[in-house]
UniProtKB/Swiss-Prot annotation:
The name this protein goes by in its record: Phosphatidylglycerol--prolipoprotein diacylglyceryl transferase
Keywords: Cell membrane, Membrane, Transferase, Transmembrane, Transmembrane helix
Binding site for a 1,2-diacyl-sn-glycero-3-phospho-(1'-sn-glycerol): 144
Record gene name: lgt
Annotated compartments: Cell membrane
GO-annotated biological processes: lipoprotein biosynthetic process
Region (Disordered): 283-322
């Protein structure tokens, strides 16, 4: 065994466990963990901007199902040859455990669901988009760990020290099952861990968003535009390293082309959006007004309890009380 082999990154022996007849999929657990972290972080960021943190959970309730549906639709459209061929079963297109989700479909349909909810509640969307952006990219980073468990979305074979070992996995009947099976211990390839490259890139963009938002007090949707630009820039070069089957457009993998187009649009939007950040009262006017009214009521109640007459304190009258 050489040094390169010793330094290689091992894949997990399996990505699916069973609790009786119920499959526990590591990929799904990673996605759920990412969603929980994103909600937690967004609540803190949205409240700091002046918004109602309870709105974040409401938005997640509509965004997550829509995002899953949108992600699946995008995946099926861009990889339609896997589901609509002579030997394919079109029903497999409905099975999200077969092939996974596409991030752009999740962002688009999930974003539309949140937009509709905020429009219904008459709450400005831009401050929320800026609050949620770091949480989204962090959730994507966590979700990429699911690809590690599934032994998928990797690049060409390599002998670099950080190469990923791909194991031969089999099901209970001994048949080859790279995603749902259990490792035999046999290494069948060492490859570029492109999922890891994207995870690290996403963490880098997460740090950039947090820093830029604090340093420049970004608002009006600019944090979200920066997230889109940063993510697509990384996806553009990482996508070209992948070797899994993909739909080709103009000689490029379709996600490479989509990333290039979306990156350009995101940069244009970022440059055209207004500078500065919304005042807390602009983030959610109704919530801010309700908070101000509640504070006034509590102040009046405190004055009544202490016997202080509002507007008639020593500080306001300039007289000492004896």
């Amino acid at each position: 065994m050489d040094v390169m082999t010793l330094a290689a990154i091992p894949s997990p022996p399996q990505g699916v466990w069973y609790l009786g007849p119920l499959p526990i999929r590591a990929y799904a657990m990673c996605i759920i963990a990412g969603i929980i972290v994103a909600i937690w972080l967004t609540r803190k960021r949205y409240a700091a901007r002046g918004g109602n943190p309870e709105v974040v959970l409401d938005a997640a309730i509509v965004a997550v199902p829509a995002g899953i549906i949108g992600g699946r639709i995008y995946h099926v459209i861009t990889d339609n040859q896997k589901y609509f061929c002579e030997t394919c079963d079109p029903v497999d297109a409905l099975k999200i455990t077969n092939g996974g989700l596409g991030i752009w479909g999740a962002v688009i349909l999930g974003g539309l669901a949140v937009w509709a909810y905020f429009r219904y509640k008459k709450i400005p969307l831009a401050p929320f988009a800026d609050a949620v952006a770091p949480g989204v990219i962090l959730a994507q980073a966590i979700g990429r760990l699911g690809n590690w468990f599934n032994q998928e979305l990797y690049g060409a074979e390599t002998d670099v020290p950080w190469a990923l070992e791909i194991y031969y996995r089999v099901d209970e009947n001994g048949r080859f099952a790279p995603v749902t099976g259990v490792s035999t211990g046999e290494v069948i390839a060492t490859v570029h861990p492109t999922f890891l490259y994207e995870m690290l890139w996403n963490l880098l963009i997460f740090g950039l968003l947090i820093w830029a938002d604090r340093r420049f007090r970004l608002g009006h949707g600019r944090v979200f535009a920066l997230y889109v630009a940063g993510y697509t820039l990384g996806r553009f070069w990482i996508e070209q390293m992948r070797t899994d089957e993909a739909t080709m457009v103009f000689g490029m993998r379709i996600n490479t082309l989509v990333s290039a187009v979306v990156f350009i649009l995101a940069v244009i939007v970022f440059l055209r959006l207004g500078k500065g950040r919304e005042a807390p009262a602009e983030v959610d006017p109704a919530y801010h007004a309700a908070q101000a009214e509640r504070d006034d009521t509590e102040t009046a109640g405190l004055d009544a309890t202490t016997g202080t007459v509002p507007g008639d304190s020593p500080e306001t009258t300039g007289k000492k009380r004896k």
